[in-house]
Regions:
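Positively charged, small/polar-rich N-terminal and surface patches that mediate targeting and assembly
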Residues: 1-100
């Protein structure tokens, strides 16, 4: 079975709702979340401090999922978070597992 890694970058205002969606989703096999700084965001979406620093506070979430579940998970995210400023990219997972 082919696995993918969906990386999401979200603003702090939607972090908890996005994590809740993933926790309840049967399509998110495993995921992590990390505080990060996002660069290249639209200037209008930044507060004054972020404009001076040139970066926005954000959360990066990496989700491991089966390739067959990609469309369903992205649709669920789009449905709930349209216009919320989420960015994403998808990469193939060459190998994954648990160290036992």
């Amino acid at each position: 079975m082919s696995e993918l890694c969906l990386t999401l970058v979200c603003p702090p205002a939607v972090e908890e709702k996005l994590l809740d969606l993933l926790l309840l989703s049967p399509h998110a096999t495993f995921f992590t979340s990390t505080a990060t700084a996002a660069h290249g965001m639209a200037h209008d979406n930044l507060d004054q401090t972020e404009q001076v620093l040139g970066r926005a506070r954000a959360t990066e979430i990496q989700v491991i999922l089966d390739a067959a579940d990609k469309a369903a998970l992205l649709e669920a995210i789009r449905r709930q978070f349209a216009g919320a400023g989420l960015r994403y990219w998808m990469t193939a997972v060459a190998e994954a597992g648990e160290i036992a």
